[in-house]
Protein backbone atom coordinates (compact mmCIF):
# COMPACT_ATOMS: atom_id res chain seq x y z
CA UNK A 1 0.00 0.00 0.00
CA UNK A 2 2.84 2.37 0.87
CA UNK A 3 4.45 1.66 -2.50
CA UNK A 4 1.19 2.35 -4.36
CA UNK A 5 0.71 5.59 -2.44
CA UNK A 6 4.26 6.69 -3.26
CA UNK A 7 3.73 5.98 -6.96
CA UNK A 8 0.45 7.91 -6.90
CA UNK A 9 2.12 10.94 -5.27
CA UNK A 10 4.94 10.87 -7.84
CA UNK A 11 2.40 10.75 -10.65
CA UNK A 12 0.54 13.70 -9.18
CA UNK A 13 3.78 15.70 -8.90
CA UNK A 14 4.68 14.83 -12.48
CA UNK A 15 1.30 16.00 -13.75
CA UNK A 16 1.61 19.19 -11.72
CA UNK A 17 5.06 19.94 -13.08
CA UNK A 18 3.92 19.25 -16.62
CA UNK A 19 0.98 21.58 -16.14
CA UNK A 20 3.17 24.37 -14.78
CA UNK A 21 5.42 24.12 -17.80
CA UNK A 22 2.65 24.12 -20.37
CA UNK A 23 -0.08 26.43 -19.12
CA UNK A 24 -0.35 30.11 -18.45
CA UNK A 25 0.23 32.12 -15.35
CA UNK A 26 -3.33 33.21 -14.86
CA UNK A 27 -6.76 33.41 -16.38
CA UNK A 28 -7.32 36.98 -15.26
CA UNK A 29 -10.67 37.27 -16.98
CA UNK A 30 -12.42 38.51 -13.85
CA UNK A 31 -9.94 40.94 -12.28
CA UNK A 32 -12.17 44.02 -12.14
CA UNK A 33 -15.22 41.90 -11.42
CA UNK A 34 -13.33 40.49 -8.44
CA UNK A 35 -11.82 43.73 -7.08
CA UNK A 36 -14.21 46.38 -8.35
CA UNK A 37 -13.69 50.03 -7.48
CA UNK A 38 -10.15 50.76 -6.30
CA UNK A 39 -9.42 53.38 -3.68
CA UNK A 40 -6.75 54.46 -1.21
CA UNK A 41 -6.92 53.52 2.46
CA UNK A 42 -4.11 54.42 4.87
CA UNK A 43 -1.69 54.87 1.97
CA UNK A 44 -2.56 51.49 0.41
CA UNK A 45 -4.32 50.61 -2.82
CA UNK A 46 -7.39 48.57 -1.86
CA UNK A 47 -10.36 46.97 -3.60
CA UNK A 48 -14.04 47.61 -2.98
CA UNK A 49 -13.93 45.39 0.12
CA UNK A 50 -10.99 47.27 1.62
CA UNK A 51 -8.48 44.49 0.84
CA UNK A 52 -4.98 45.35 -0.38
CA UNK A 53 -4.46 45.02 -4.13
CA UNK A 54 -1.19 44.81 -6.04
CA UNK A 55 -1.43 45.43 -9.77
CA UNK A 56 1.28 44.13 -12.09
CA UNK A 57 1.45 44.64 -15.80
CA UNK A 58 3.04 46.20 -18.84
CA UNK A 59 3.36 49.68 -20.24
CA UNK A 60 3.28 50.35 -23.94
CA UNK A 61 6.08 52.32 -25.52
CA UNK A 62 5.07 55.56 -27.22
CA UNK A 63 1.78 54.92 -28.96
CA UNK A 64 2.78 57.17 -31.86
CA UNK A 65 5.72 54.87 -32.61
CA UNK A 66 4.74 51.39 -31.46
CA UNK A 67 0.98 51.52 -31.25
CA UNK A 68 0.72 48.38 -33.37
CA UNK A 69 1.44 46.32 -30.23
CA UNK A 70 -1.53 47.80 -28.38
CA UNK A 71 -4.69 46.00 -29.42
CA UNK A 72 -7.30 43.66 -28.00
CA UNK A 73 -5.47 40.48 -29.00
CA UNK A 74 -2.07 41.49 -27.60
CA UNK A 75 -3.64 42.67 -24.35
CA UNK A 76 -5.65 39.46 -24.11
CA UNK A 77 -2.46 37.45 -24.54
CA UNK A 78 -0.76 39.50 -21.84
CA UNK A 79 -3.70 38.83 -19.53
CA UNK A 80 -4.04 35.12 -20.27
CA UNK A 81 -0.41 34.08 -20.78
CA UNK A 82 1.55 36.56 -18.67
CA UNK A 83 -1.10 37.13 -16.01
CA UNK A 84 -1.19 40.94 -16.13
CA UNK A 85 -4.01 42.71 -14.36
CA UNK A 86 -3.14 46.24 -15.53
CA UNK A 87 -1.99 47.79 -18.81
CA UNK A 88 -0.55 51.28 -19.26
CA UNK A 89 -1.19 53.18 -22.50
CA UNK A 90 1.69 55.67 -22.81
CA UNK A 91 0.56 58.60 -24.93
CA UNK A 92 3.48 60.97 -25.44
CA UNK A 93 2.54 64.62 -25.52
CA UNK A 94 5.51 65.86 -27.57
CA UNK A 95 7.89 63.97 -29.91
CA UNK A 96 5.16 63.30 -32.44
CA UNK A 97 2.58 62.49 -29.79
CA UNK A 98 -0.77 64.04 -28.92
CA UNK A 99 0.24 67.70 -29.22
CA UNK A 100 1.53 67.13 -32.75
CA UNK A 101 -1.10 64.56 -33.73
CA UNK A 102 -4.24 64.48 -31.57
CA UNK A 103 -5.50 61.39 -33.41
CA UNK A 104 -3.11 59.28 -31.31
CA UNK A 105 -5.77 59.43 -28.61
CA UNK A 106 -7.74 56.93 -30.71
CA UNK A 107 -5.15 54.33 -29.78
CA UNK A 108 -5.64 55.25 -26.11
CA UNK A 109 -9.36 54.66 -26.54
CA UNK A 110 -8.64 51.32 -28.20
CA UNK A 111 -6.52 50.28 -25.22
CA UNK A 112 -9.11 51.42 -22.68
CA UNK A 113 -11.97 49.69 -24.44
CA UNK A 114 -9.92 46.50 -24.80
CA UNK A 115 -9.12 46.59 -21.07
CA UNK A 116 -12.80 47.05 -20.23
CA UNK A 117 -13.71 44.08 -22.44
CA UNK A 118 -10.90 42.02 -20.89
CA UNK A 119 -11.87 43.04 -17.34
CA UNK A 120 -8.43 44.36 -16.38
CA UNK A 121 -7.32 47.78 -15.16
CA UNK A 122 -5.86 50.35 -17.55
CA UNK A 123 -3.73 53.46 -17.02
CA UNK A 124 -4.29 56.44 -19.31
CA UNK A 125 -0.82 57.99 -19.29
CA UNK A 126 -0.26 61.65 -20.26
CA UNK A 127 3.38 60.98 -21.07
CA UNK A 128 5.29 64.22 -20.63
CA UNK A 129 9.06 63.80 -21.00
CA UNK A 130 11.01 66.23 -23.18
CA UNK A 131 8.31 68.79 -22.34
CA UNK A 132 9.60 68.66 -18.81
CA UNK A 133 7.11 70.99 -17.11
CA UNK A 134 3.53 69.66 -17.12
CA UNK A 135 2.24 73.23 -17.25
CA UNK A 136 3.52 73.66 -20.82
CA UNK A 137 0.53 71.75 -22.15
CA UNK A 138 -1.75 72.16 -19.13
CA UNK A 139 -4.77 73.36 -21.11
CA UNK A 140 -4.44 70.47 -23.55
CA UNK A 141 -4.18 68.08 -20.61
CA UNK A 142 -7.37 69.48 -19.10
CA UNK A 143 -9.22 69.04 -22.39
CA UNK A 144 -7.87 65.52 -22.86
CA UNK A 145 -8.72 64.30 -19.37
CA UNK A 146 -12.12 65.95 -19.56
CA UNK A 147 -12.84 63.85 -22.64
CA UNK A 148 -11.37 60.63 -21.23
CA UNK A 149 -13.14 60.93 -17.88
CA UNK A 150 -16.43 61.75 -19.56
CA UNK A 151 -16.11 58.69 -21.80
CA UNK A 152 -14.81 56.21 -19.23
CA UNK A 153 -15.44 57.65 -15.79
CA UNK A 154 -18.19 55.15 -15.05
CA UNK A 155 -15.81 52.20 -15.47
CA UNK A 156 -13.81 51.12 -12.40
CA UNK A 157 -11.13 49.77 -14.78
CA UNK A 158 -9.71 53.23 -15.45
CA UNK A 159 -6.71 54.88 -13.77
CA UNK A 160 -5.49 58.32 -14.87
CA UNK A 161 -1.80 59.25 -14.90
CA UNK A 162 -1.71 62.98 -15.46
CA UNK A 163 2.03 63.72 -15.72
CA UNK A 164 4.46 60.92 -16.55
CA UNK A 165 7.88 62.33 -15.65
CA UNK A 166 8.22 65.98 -14.70
CA UNK A 167 11.91 66.82 -14.83
CA UNK A 168 14.47 69.60 -14.71
CA UNK A 169 16.00 71.54 -11.84
CA UNK A 170 13.40 74.30 -12.19
CA UNK A 171 10.43 71.90 -12.10
CA UNK A 172 9.61 71.22 -8.47
CA UNK A 173 6.73 69.59 -6.66
CA UNK A 174 5.58 72.67 -4.79
CA UNK A 175 5.97 75.26 -7.54
CA UNK A 176 4.99 73.45 -10.74
CA UNK A 177 3.72 69.88 -10.30
CA UNK A 178 1.29 70.18 -7.40
CA UNK A 179 -0.35 73.37 -8.77
CA UNK A 180 -0.75 71.64 -12.14
CA UNK A 181 -2.37 68.63 -10.48
CA UNK A 182 -4.70 70.89 -8.51
CA UNK A 183 -6.06 72.22 -11.81
CA UNK A 184 -6.28 68.92 -13.70
CA UNK A 185 -7.72 66.73 -10.94
CA UNK A 186 -10.97 68.74 -10.57
CA UNK A 187 -11.56 68.37 -14.32
CA UNK A 188 -11.46 64.59 -13.93
CA UNK A 189 -13.47 64.62 -10.72
CA UNK A 190 -16.25 66.56 -12.41
CA UNK A 191 -16.91 63.43 -14.50
CA UNK A 192 -15.35 60.70 -12.39
CA UNK A 193 -15.46 61.15 -8.62
CA UNK A 194 -13.83 57.86 -7.65
CA UNK A 195 -11.17 56.36 -9.91
CA UNK A 196 -7.50 56.47 -8.99
CA UNK A 197 -5.36 59.37 -10.26
CA UNK A 198 -1.57 58.99 -10.42
CA UNK A 199 0.49 62.18 -10.27
CA UNK A 200 4.09 62.30 -11.45
CA UNK A 201 6.80 63.62 -9.15
CA UNK A 202 10.02 65.57 -9.69
CA UNK A 203 13.28 64.31 -11.24
CA UNK A 204 11.58 61.92 -13.66
CA UNK A 205 9.12 60.73 -11.00
CA UNK A 206 11.76 59.86 -8.42
CA UNK A 207 11.13 62.58 -5.82
CA UNK A 208 8.20 60.96 -4.05
CA UNK A 209 9.60 62.18 -0.74
CA UNK A 210 8.87 65.78 -1.71
CA UNK A 211 5.29 64.93 -2.65
CA UNK A 212 4.89 63.00 0.61
CA UNK A 213 5.75 66.14 2.57
CA UNK A 214 3.15 68.21 0.71
CA UNK A 215 0.38 65.88 -0.37
CA UNK A 216 -2.66 66.59 -2.50
CA UNK A 217 -6.06 66.78 -0.85
CA UNK A 218 -7.80 64.27 -3.12
CA UNK A 219 -8.22 61.01 -1.17
CA UNK A 220 -7.72 58.74 -4.19
CA UNK A 221 -4.43 60.10 -5.49
CA UNK A 222 -1.24 58.07 -5.82
CA UNK A 223 2.25 59.40 -6.50
CA UNK A 224 4.28 58.03 -9.40
CA UNK A 225 7.67 56.51 -8.75
CA UNK A 226 9.87 55.36 -11.65
CA UNK A 227 13.18 53.49 -11.66
CA UNK A 228 15.54 51.63 -13.98
CA UNK A 229 17.38 48.75 -12.37
CA UNK A 230 20.75 49.46 -14.00
CA UNK A 231 20.87 53.05 -12.74
CA UNK A 232 18.80 53.40 -9.58
CA UNK A 233 19.39 51.71 -6.25
CA UNK A 234 19.14 51.92 -2.50
CA UNK A 235 18.97 55.70 -2.17
CA UNK A 236 15.74 55.74 -4.18
CA UNK A 237 14.34 52.82 -2.22
CA UNK A 238 14.98 54.88 0.89
CA UNK A 239 13.02 57.77 -0.63
CA UNK A 240 10.09 55.46 -1.32
CA UNK A 241 10.17 54.14 2.23
CA UNK A 242 10.17 57.69 3.56
CA UNK A 243 7.14 58.55 1.42
CA UNK A 244 5.30 55.44 2.56
CA UNK A 245 6.04 56.31 6.18
CA UNK A 246 4.31 59.66 5.58
CA UNK A 247 1.20 57.83 4.38
CA UNK A 248 1.68 58.61 0.69
CA UNK A 249 0.31 56.02 -1.74
CA UNK A 250 2.93 55.05 -4.33
CA UNK A 251 2.39 53.49 -7.76
CA UNK A 252 5.46 52.37 -9.73
CA UNK A 253 3.86 53.23 -13.04
CA UNK A 254 7.10 52.70 -14.98
CA UNK A 255 10.22 50.66 -14.34
CA UNK A 256 12.77 48.94 -16.53
CA UNK A 257 15.37 46.21 -16.33
CA UNK A 258 17.85 48.42 -18.21
CA UNK A 259 19.73 51.63 -17.49
CA UNK A 260 17.72 54.84 -17.27
CA UNK A 261 18.13 55.45 -21.00
CA UNK A 262 15.95 52.41 -21.68
CA UNK A 263 19.01 50.63 -23.06
CA UNK A 264 22.10 48.94 -21.61
CA UNK A 265 21.96 45.84 -19.50
CA UNK A 266 19.79 43.82 -18.84
CA UNK A 267 20.33 44.12 -15.05
CA UNK A 268 18.34 41.14 -13.82
CA UNK A 269 19.95 40.79 -10.37
CA UNK A 270 19.26 44.43 -9.61
CA UNK A 271 15.76 44.09 -11.05
CA UNK A 272 15.08 41.19 -8.69
CA UNK A 273 16.06 43.36 -5.71
CA UNK A 274 13.50 45.90 -6.87
CA UNK A 275 10.85 43.21 -7.47
CA UNK A 276 11.32 41.96 -3.90
CA UNK A 277 11.18 45.52 -2.58
CA UNK A 278 7.89 46.21 -4.38
CA UNK A 279 6.36 42.90 -3.31
CA UNK A 280 7.27 43.46 0.33
CA UNK A 281 5.53 46.85 0.24
CA UNK A 282 2.63 45.81 -1.96
CA UNK A 283 3.55 48.38 -4.60
CA UNK A 284 1.74 48.11 -7.92
CA UNK A 285 3.81 48.38 -11.08
CA UNK A 286 3.97 48.51 -14.88
CA UNK A 287 7.09 47.45 -16.75
CA UNK A 288 8.56 49.47 -19.63
CA UNK A 289 7.84 48.41 -22.34
CA UNK A 290 5.77 46.41 -24.82
CA UNK A 291 7.72 46.99 -28.01
CA UNK A 292 10.18 45.34 -30.37
CA UNK A 293 12.47 48.39 -30.36
CA UNK A 294 16.18 47.61 -30.43
CA UNK A 295 16.81 48.47 -26.79
CA UNK A 296 17.30 46.25 -23.78
CA UNK A 297 14.17 47.37 -21.90
CA UNK A 298 11.96 46.20 -24.78
CA UNK A 299 9.94 43.08 -23.97
CA UNK A 300 9.88 41.75 -27.54
CA UNK A 301 12.38 40.87 -30.24
CA UNK A 302 12.29 42.39 -33.74
CA UNK A 303 9.69 40.67 -35.87
CA UNK A 304 7.45 39.71 -32.93
CA UNK A 305 3.78 39.38 -33.78
CA UNK A 306 1.95 42.60 -32.82
CA UNK A 307 -1.11 40.61 -31.74
CA UNK A 308 0.50 38.35 -29.13
CA UNK A 309 1.01 34.60 -29.15
CA UNK A 310 4.72 35.20 -28.53
CA UNK A 311 7.09 32.26 -28.49
CA UNK A 312 10.18 32.18 -26.27
CA UNK A 313 12.22 33.27 -29.28
CA UNK A 314 10.06 36.38 -29.65
CA UNK A 315 10.65 37.50 -26.06
CA UNK A 316 13.72 39.54 -25.18
CA UNK A 317 15.73 38.75 -22.02
CA UNK A 318 13.80 41.55 -20.31
CA UNK A 319 10.45 40.27 -21.56
CA UNK A 320 11.27 36.73 -20.46
CA UNK A 321 12.19 37.93 -16.96
CA UNK A 322 9.18 40.19 -16.51
CA UNK A 323 6.75 37.57 -17.80
CA UNK A 324 8.17 35.09 -15.30
CA UNK A 325 7.81 37.57 -12.43
CA UNK A 326 4.18 38.34 -13.25
CA UNK A 327 3.34 34.67 -13.70
CA UNK A 328 4.89 33.83 -10.33
CA UNK A 329 2.50 36.10 -8.49
CA UNK A 330 -0.65 35.83 -10.60
CA UNK A 331 -3.39 34.78 -8.24
CA UNK A 332 -5.94 33.27 -10.62
CA UNK A 333 -5.63 29.61 -11.72
CA UNK A 334 -3.80 28.88 -15.00
CA UNK A 335 -5.53 28.87 -18.36
CA UNK A 336 -4.42 27.78 -21.79
CA UNK A 337 -4.78 30.70 -24.19
CA UNK A 338 -5.09 30.04 -27.88
CA UNK A 339 -2.47 31.98 -29.86
CA UNK A 340 -4.27 34.62 -31.92
CA UNK A 341 -4.34 34.39 -35.66
CA UNK A 342 -2.31 36.99 -37.53
CA UNK A 343 -4.70 39.66 -38.78
CA UNK A 344 -2.07 40.65 -41.29
CA UNK A 345 -2.40 37.56 -43.46
CA UNK A 346 -2.67 38.85 -47.04
CA UNK A 347 -5.68 38.07 -49.15
CA UNK A 348 -4.64 35.00 -51.20
CA UNK A 349 -6.56 36.34 -54.21
CA UNK A 350 -6.11 40.11 -54.21
CA UNK A 351 -8.26 42.07 -56.62
CA UNK A 352 -6.67 42.60 -59.98
CA UNK A 353 -7.89 46.16 -60.45
CA UNK A 354 -6.09 48.59 -58.12
CA UNK A 355 -8.50 51.26 -59.23
CA UNK A 356 -11.14 49.74 -56.97
CA UNK A 357 -9.14 50.86 -53.92
CA UNK A 358 -8.25 54.33 -52.65
CA UNK A 359 -4.75 55.70 -52.69
CA UNK A 360 -2.94 55.71 -49.36
CA UNK A 361 -3.61 58.95 -47.46
CA UNK A 362 -1.15 59.83 -44.65
CA UNK A 363 -3.91 61.71 -42.83
CA UNK A 364 -6.32 58.77 -42.83
CA UNK A 365 -6.59 56.26 -39.97
CA UNK A 366 -6.50 52.62 -41.13
CA UNK A 367 -7.16 49.41 -39.22
CA UNK A 368 -7.71 46.62 -41.77
CA UNK A 369 -8.33 48.51 -45.01
CA UNK A 370 -6.70 47.95 -48.41
CA UNK A 371 -5.04 50.88 -50.17
CA UNK A 372 -3.09 51.45 -53.38
CA UNK A 373 0.40 52.94 -53.09
CA UNK A 374 3.49 52.99 -55.31
CA UNK A 375 2.08 50.56 -57.84
CA UNK A 376 0.71 47.90 -55.51
CA UNK A 377 -1.99 47.04 -53.00
CA UNK A 378 -1.37 47.06 -49.25
CA UNK A 379 -3.53 45.96 -46.33
CA UNK A 380 -3.24 47.44 -42.83
CA UNK A 381 -2.44 44.76 -40.24
CA UNK A 382 -3.16 47.05 -37.29
CA UNK A 383 -4.15 50.62 -36.45
CA UNK A 384 -2.00 53.10 -38.32
CA UNK A 385 -1.83 56.68 -39.44
CA UNK A 386 0.95 58.48 -41.33
CA UNK A 387 3.04 55.29 -41.65
CA UNK A 388 3.84 54.82 -45.33
CA UNK A 389 3.42 51.35 -46.85
CA UNK A 390 6.75 49.69 -47.54
CA UNK A 391 8.41 49.47 -44.12
CA UNK A 392 9.04 45.72 -43.50
CA UNK A 393 8.41 46.21 -39.76
CA UNK A 394 5.47 48.52 -40.31
CA UNK A 395 1.73 47.94 -40.32
CA UNK A 396 1.28 47.30 -44.05
CA UNK A 397 1.22 43.90 -45.76
CA UNK A 398 1.73 43.79 -49.57
CA UNK A 399 -1.07 42.03 -51.44
CA UNK A 400 0.33 41.82 -54.96
UniProtKB/Swiss-Prot annotation:
Q: Show the ranges annotated as biased composition (Pro residues).
A: 334-353
Listed binding positions for substrate are 61, 65-66, 92, 127, 228, 260-261, 288, 293-295
Keyword set, alphabetical order: Carbohydrate metabolism, Cellulose degradation, Glycosidase, Hydrolase, Polysaccharide degradation, Secreted, Signal
Superkingdom = Bacteria
A Gene Ontology annotation in the biological process aspect, one of them, is: cellulose catabolic process
Signal peptide segment: 1-26
Reaction(s) catalysed by this chain, per the record, are: Endohydrolysis of (1->4)-beta-D-glucosidic linkages in cellulose, lichenin and cereal beta-D-glucans
The molecular function terms in GO held by this entry are:
carbohydrate binding; cellulase activity
| Pfam families named among the record's database cross-references | CBM_5_12, Cellulase
Q: What is its EC number?
A: 3.2.1.4
List, from the UniProt record, the residues annotated as the active site of this protein. Answer: 165 (proton donor), 254 (nucleophile)
Q: Does the keyword Signal apply?
A: yes
Has UniProt tagged this entry with the keyword Hydrolase? yes
Name all Chitin-binding type-3 domain ranges. Answer: 357-396
Q: Where is this region: Disordered?
A: 328-363
Question: What compartments host this protein?
Answer: Secreted
Q: Name one GO cellular component term.
A: extracellular region
Quaternary organization: Monomer.
- Please report which protein family the annotation says this sequence is part of: Belongs to the glycosyl hydrolase 5 (cellulase A) family.
How is this protein named in the record?
Endoglucanase 5A
Q: What species was this sequence derived from?
A: Salipaludibacillus agaradhaerens
The encoding gene? cel5A
Amino acid sequence: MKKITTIFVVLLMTVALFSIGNTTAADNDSVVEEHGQLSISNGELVNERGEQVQLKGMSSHGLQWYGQFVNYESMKWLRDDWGINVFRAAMYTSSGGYIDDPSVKEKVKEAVEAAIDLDIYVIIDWHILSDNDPNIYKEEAKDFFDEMSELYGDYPNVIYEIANEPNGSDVTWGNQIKPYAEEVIPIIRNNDPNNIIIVGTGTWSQDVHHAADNQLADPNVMYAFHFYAGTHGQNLRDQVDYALDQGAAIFVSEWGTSAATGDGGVFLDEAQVWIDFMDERNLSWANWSLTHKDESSAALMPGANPTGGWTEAELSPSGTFVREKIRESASIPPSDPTPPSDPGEPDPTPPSDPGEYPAWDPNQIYTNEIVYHNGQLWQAKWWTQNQEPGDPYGPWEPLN
